[in-house]
Amino acid sequence: MSAHDPHASLARPAAKAWHARLELGFERQPGGRTALAHRRHVGPLRVQRALYPEGDAICHAVIVHPPGGVAGGDRLEIDVKLDAGTHAVLTTPGATKWYKSNGLDARQRIDIDVGARAKLDWLPQNNLFFDATHASLEFVLKLGDGASVLGWDAAQLGRQAAGEAWSTGSVASFSKIVGPSGRALWVERARLDARDPLRAAPQGLGGFPVYGTLWALGPACTNALAESIAPALPFDDALRAGVTCIAPGTMLIRALAHSMEALQHLFAEQWLALRPIVHGIDAKPLRLWQT
């Protein structure tokens, strides 16, 4: 990416802000096929056609946002529902770029409902926050009885490839995972300001510009599993990771890094290792990752 990327200071007038919404619904058909039965979009947020590289039981779909990035005043809303017994793999083709603010916040809301005994692999590319971004992100995931989920969220502050630091701006985030009983299994609310000392503090980001969380959810996610993973996780000046089983069936791997490539590689490795345990299904690298 060039240091003269014209999107770095994109200031779209509020009247031209995008309000995009995408609804996806997966249902189980006779014979065990997972079908993308409901698909509705408003604005420039949509999904490419359903793919079946692993056979009919697992539906793969790629969510795309054609303009390529999110500017001040934009609102993105994604609602996903997996019916009982379905299995979906959702990803994105590239990083979501959050451009310099025009004075308005850019907002994203994602709501996912995973039905009983359904399986979800939520594998988006990372968020890339440009300098002077003002963004607000909300993520809510609901689990049905016997459901399992592997997914992640990763972010980078500033465009390192362009030599750009994240010196001004703010990112507000809210994440919530809700169990079958309706009880929250994990809730995290954070507001990160570019000038906050917490960015450099050991109890914060420790000076790392890249951070992320991988969550593994389901009956197989136990303290014993977390303890078996922990010794192999890196903890050095380039990449630091730790794992915790915060509640029965809820395991988190948190990571800090100096490069997004290193963090993505770690999360992809963990997904490949965890999928047979959490979903009971072998894993292969997504074809999209290899392009």
From Swiss-Prot:
It comes from the Bacteria. InterPro entries: UreD. One of its GO terms (cellular component) is cytoplasm. Keywords: Chaperone, Cytoplasm, Nickel insertion. GO terms for molecular function: nickel cation binding. Its main location: cytoplasm. It is found in: Cytoplasm. Required for maturation of urease via the functional incorporation of the urease nickel metallocenter. Belongs to the UreD family. UreD, UreF and UreG form a complex that acts as a GTP-hydrolysis-dependent molecular chaperone, activating the urease apoprotein by helping to assemble the nickel containing metallocenter of UreC. The UreE protein probably delivers the nickel. This is Urease accessory protein UreD. The gene is ureD.
